[in-house]
Amino acid sequence: MAANGIMEVTDSNFDQDVLKSDTPVLLDFWATWCGPCRALAPIVDELAKDFQGKLKIGKMDVDRNGATPMRYKVTGIPTLLVFKGGQVVEQLVGYKPKEAIAEALKKHVG
């Protein structure tokens, strides 16, 4: 886990860290070459602080992990998926402002 509390999620740890999580998980699908992904990164970092203890936040590099994005039909990045109880409960595709993401997350956390 990174210093900012954000998990690095891979195809191999996805089931354990995301699907079996007791708390909701926001998973950010990104790539190093993706400009909008880089623009979204500081927002995801801020959300990790704002929602600390209420949900987990993870990032998955789509260039290093192909199975999970294919499984969830992630065709454009950045894509944010919110998982709760092992199911996708929210999907946000493309760059979104912090307020829009926070509103979506509030629907799924205690």
Region spans (language model):
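Proteins that catalyze or organize thiol-disulfide redox chemistry
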Residues: 1-26, 31-56, 64-110
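Conserved residues in the N-terminal Rossmann fold of short-chain dehydrogenase/reductase
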Residues: 59
